[in-house]
C-alpha cells in the first residue's frame, strides 16, 4: 500500500488512490464477483498517503450465488441460518463500506502509530483507559 501511495504521489500528485477489483479469493465470501471476470470482485480500497482508510464493495444479494460461493470455499453454514434466511426471502442489491476514522486521523495529523490518533486505544497490553 505504501509503495502504491508513493507511486501515485510521484506520478499524479495524488494522495488518494482507489484500488479496485481485488481477487475473489482475497475478499469475504459475500463480496460480489465481477460478472466479466469472476476471479475478481466488485470491491475497492481507498488509500490515503499509502494507508488503507476505507474498504468497500458490492455484496452478493442472490441466495443461490451466495450458497455457491459458500460451498466453493468449503464453508459450513451452521450458525448462519438467520443471515441466509434473509437472502432466501429476497435481498435487494446492496453494497457497503467501512472507514477507519482513526487511520484517517492518523494520516491527517502525521502520526506514525494509530494509537496516537485514538481516544482510548486498545492493544495486547492495554484493555482499559
Identify the role of each PLM range.
Residues 1-129:
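A translation/RNA-centric and nucleic-acid-associated enzymatic feature enriched
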Amino acid at each position: 500500500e505504501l509503495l502504491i501511495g508513493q507511486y501515485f504521489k510521484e506520478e499524479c500528485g495524488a494522495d488518494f488512490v482507489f484500488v479496485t477489483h481485488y481477487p475473489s479469493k482475497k475478499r469475504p465470501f459475500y463480496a460480489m464477483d465481477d460478472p466479466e471476470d469472476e476471479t475478481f470482485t466488485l470491491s475497492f480500497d481507498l488509500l490515503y498517503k499509502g494507508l488503507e482508510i476505507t474498504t468497500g464493495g458490492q455484496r452478493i444479494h442472490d441466495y443461490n450465488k451466495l450458497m455457491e460461493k459458500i460451498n466453493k470455499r468449503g464453508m459450513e453454514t451452521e450458525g448462519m441460518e438467520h443471515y441466509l434466511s434473509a437472502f432466501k426471502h429476497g435481498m435487494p442489491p446492496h453494497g457497503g463500506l467501512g472507514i477507519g476514522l482513526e487511520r484517517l486521523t492518523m494520516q491527517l495529523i502525521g502520526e506514525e502509530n494509530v494509537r496516537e490518533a485514538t481516544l482510548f486505544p486498545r492493544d495486547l497490553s492495554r484493555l482499559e483507559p
